[in-house]
Amino acid sequence: MSRPIEFKTILLACLIISVGQLSMGLVFPSLPWIAKDFDISLDQAQLLVSVYLLGFGPSQFIYGPVSDALGRKKVLLAGLLIAMLGLLMIIFLSHTFTGMVAGRFLQGLGTGCCAVLARASTRDRFNGPELPVALSYIAMAASITPLVAPVIGGFINAHFGWTMVFISLLGYVLLAWTVIVFRFQETITQTSAMPSPKKMLLQYRDLLTSRYFMSFASIGWLNFSLMITTVSVMPFIMQNQIGMTSDQYAMWALIPAFGMICGTSICNRVRPIIGTKKMLLVTPILHVSSAAWLFFCPVEPLYLMLGQLLMILGNAIALPCAQAMVMQPYKKQAGAAAAMSGGGQMVVSSIVSMALVQLGLSQAWHLSLVIVVFATITLTNVLRGFATEQPSEQ
């Protein structure tokens, strides 16, 4: 009989990964008010998002290998201290936009540790069939947080002003830091010397040239990209083409969020019975069904959300299964593997979503064609990944 899974470890990982997601999503609704207060354009206010991502994305590639050498807890605490320093800069320099931009970059630089080390510490703790279950909860937290964060941020901004958004973030990061100090137990048993830049680059080169790693990592990258693209396009369809207000859309958007919870629950219950490969093969089926629905359905809220629900169900199954397959062979280099997986996810999703928007993706049937292409690539990578021999323990 298998031992019960350690939910305390999973909850800690979910708390850690939510810090980075909240730090981005909570600020979105405040941008128009920040632009108005500083008498700048909305495009200029978007710089607060861009510089955050500039710090958040690349820093992951450093945190991963460093935590493999020095341990997860020290690196987490140091990263969150940097994030709090950035937030203090934003709060106390809120009278100058330049000061806020500098603070946001520092905040992103600090919170870059969260996604990497949440996954790496989970890989340290769990093995075998427990790993996909644990990672499914983390994937759910990472996916739902960006959906609910703008709703929370909009409420805080509407009732207390945009400065309170950053004060709330500071409080949340401080809470996470305190919990880690007292509750997080180091998951690395042996520390080593700090890796040189050359060694880091060699580790990433080995991962990028691994057919196994790239097959499963790209499944996660493309599924996350599909979610980000849909989140960007669907508000335009619902608000501009249907005439829905942002408050109304926020309520409808809870349906896809519910789909993420359902998909994760289905994955956790069915995967141990049919296996990871068959579970992953369900994703292209759900995505093609979603594409067909969105292509033919009327442009009405309920129909559009049901189509997105089918897509999200596929994402909720693919993300934890692919992440588990990515991390499985890399116990001693879990930080580097998590960094490449998570950092690559950020890079690919940014490029893909921007490229599709630039190509004029603005209709539901446009989205359906994109989903079909992504489903085909996912199917190819699933078959290729399982046909490739798993790398030996690193």
Regions found by a protein language model. Give the residues of each.
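C-terminal transmembrane helical hairpin of 12-TM major facilitator-type secondary transporters
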Residues: 277-322
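Cytoplasmic helix-loop-helix junction between adjacent transmembrane helices
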Residues: 103-144
